[in-house]
Amino acid sequence: MDSKTPVTLAKVIKVLGRTGSRGGVTQVRVEFLEDTSRTIVRNVKGPVRENDILVLMESEREARRLR
């Protein structure tokens, strides 16, 4: 990770479910730490739980909802 790359910190407020062909991805709703009124849905690979802090390299992309 380059030190000049802008990153955004986001807090996991709700775990929505597992997705991916083998369930290896978790869909979560995150709240930005700088702007707490803004929330988006993201896909996260690896272990994650509520109140975890994520470092988002790209903060505009939102995941499609689970069916």
From Swiss-Prot:
InterPro entries: NA-bd_OB-fold, Ribosomal_eS28, Ribosomal_eS28_CS. N-terminally acetylated by acetyltransferase NatB. It is found in: Cytoplasm. Keywords: Acetylation, Cytoplasm, Ribonucleoprotein, Ribosomal protein. The keyword Transmembrane does not apply. SUPFAM superfamilies: Nucleic acid-binding proteins (SSF50249). One of its GO terms (biological process) is ribosomal small subunit assembly. It holds the Pfam family Ribosomal_S28e. It comes from the Eukaryota. The modification N-acetylmethionine is found at M1. GO terms for cellular component: cytosol; cytosolic small ribosomal subunit. The keyword Cytoplasm applies. Its main location: cytoplasm. One of its GO terms (molecular function) is structural constituent of ribosome. Component of the small ribosomal subunit (SSU). Mature yeast ribosomes consist of a small (40S) and a large (60S) subunit. The 40S small subunit contains 1 molecule of ribosomal RNA (18S rRNA) and 33 different proteins (encoded by 57 genes). The large 60S subunit contains 3 rRNA molecules (25S, 5.8S and 5S rRNA) and 46 different proteins (encoded by 81 genes). Present with 8600 molecules/cell in log phase SD medium. There are 2 genes for eS28 in yeast. Component of the ribosome, a large ribonucleoprotein complex responsible for the synthesis of proteins in the cell. The small ribosomal subunit (SSU) binds messenger RNAs (mRNAs) and translates the encoded message by selecting cognate aminoacyl-transfer RNA (tRNA) molecules. The large subunit (LSU) contains the ribosomal catalytic site termed the peptidyl transferase center (PTC), which catalyzes the formation of peptide bonds, thereby polymerizing the amino acids delivered by tRNAs into a polypeptide chain. Belongs to the eukaryotic ribosomal protein eS28 family. This is Small ribosomal subunit protein eS28B. It comes from Saccharomyces cerevisiae (strain ATCC 204508 / S288c). The gene is RPS28B.
